[in-house]
């Protein structure tokens, strides 16, 4: 199950968003405006991927899953485009299923048995992780996701990554 990458555009993602198939995971660690934006969107459209004490302790730097519409994508473009703000997720699954899927990957275990936060939603991390994953890992990580889109602030390009 290799991956295929191609350039995409915000216009293409906006068309998918109109059909309700686009989510974004916004990384508050590199974009301090994210927690307030998530709060303004409300719990039906935006929620931290963290639960419990992690959510309480790390709300200011947490990843937030948001159902994306054209307004949110435009906000990302105008407010966050020059930062490593997060990733786009294309999925027909409902909000709760997408959140549950990604919560499974927030922590990883090191070879020494320590637990670490896995920042897969960082656009600098996701492509490297996907390229180094085997078929079973890709199948598990894609799950209900049809594709990911990552933005590179360095060259200002948006890339769509699909499992093939």
Each model region followed by its residue ranges:
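Terminal low-complexity "docking" segments
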Residues: 1-118, 123-164
């Amino acid at each position: 199950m290799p991956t295929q990458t191609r350039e995409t555009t915000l216009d293409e993602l906006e068309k998918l968003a109109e059909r309700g198939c686009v989510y974004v995971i916004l990384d508050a660690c590199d974009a301090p405006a994210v927690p307030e934006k998530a709060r303004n969107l409300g719990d039906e459209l935006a929620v931290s991927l963290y639960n419990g004490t992690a959510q309480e302790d790390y709300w200011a730097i947490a990843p937030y899953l948001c159902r994306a519409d054209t307004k949110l994508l435009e906000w990302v473009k105008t407010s966050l485009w020059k930062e490593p703000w997060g990733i786009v997720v294309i999925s027909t699954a409902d909000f709760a299923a997408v959140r549950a899927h990604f919560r499974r990957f927030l922590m990883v275990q090191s070879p020494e048995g320590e637990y670490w936060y896995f920042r897969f939603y960082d656009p600098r991390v996701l492509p490297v992780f996907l390229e180094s994953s085997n078929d079973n890992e890709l199948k598990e990580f894609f799950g209900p996701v049809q594709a990911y889109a990552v933005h590179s602030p360095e060259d200002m390009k948006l890339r769509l990554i699909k499992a093939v």
